[in-house]
């Protein structure tokens, strides 16, 4: 008989001491109560730096399953670049160093372009400051900043303050000068609106647009300007504005586009680097630039260097189990199927050898408060059958209810969702015990543990609360301070397999 291990992920199930807002506490959960009382149980981190996100940021299903399957903290781009700037790795980044060396060799200018805010969705202003410091430390003085103004991921009229802050920081560093500002409406289009992008390009290359000697003042003036629809021109819509006495982007120069999210960085980048670009006429033809994308915007993008290349996750749990000849099953309903397959496998779509997958259709309802049971029962039927078949070494199972119903903000529905999961967990446990296997019970992030905001309104987001980790079917001791990336090393320990060096997580079982 195979050495069976089942990992059951209760999506959106966090531990929250505040009972009044907590659908999990309000639910009747005899099976979970029994597990948490009788079996080795601890809390593990599922948010912030524990999963490669900034401190205090809630986790999500994609990040959670990626970290579980990888067996290591997988840093998201914002955190990855911030960490690189803080620990000095940025100074050694080949693409960034080469861009600066190009300017030194040719006596040309360095242009830093990107979203000028601390929103952290597309960019972060701290990354800009780090780049200016790096270029200054490497001996450059001609450093020009082309700021795309936000107003979506930060307040709509905050750009003037960001410009003031940037100017103060540049004065402190002793380098860096704002050369162009414009709303992201122009510089970060993603719908092939080439008339807008053309205006951005004209300002950056030809110096066409509103002329000013004070970027912040020009933006504040924009706030008082009404467009043809009768709306004030807030940050997102500020017209392309050129600061007098600054240089334009020209052949021989280096450009570093410091946005890390690809979707809104592709179009403006293509105007500079694609010889076949035909969205509008580039007067004078394509410029000869040393162009660096902060991350990979598009694998087919020509004539660019990439500063932070995609992370290749070698030896994820699924890949490693396949290599060891073990059989595995991934099972979830539609809403979480990609999470137990694609994300759990580190962004790899293909099935590994001896990896089976079962997809159960999620119910077709407008919102899941209308059917909080979702498809948990049919998922449970199929997984119990798979467990008792004796066919699998490892089964990865997800119950979607606590998360998907939690997002509706309907407290009573979330309670029903939790109770449904409790019933299913009890059935899965019975099947695992029948086969003398081991079950690990956990979650990827919180949600149903907080359904009411401080002001009394429905709370529909994820939480930053820790999640459970329980071991059913084996007596053992668990350490504190674990996180999601420690689950795969724990699984390998239980299976008696050596941990691959790529997995830097540590088993939660101490004996």
What are these regions (language model features)?
Residues 1-511:
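Feature captures the catalytic ectodomains and active-site-proximal regions of enzymes
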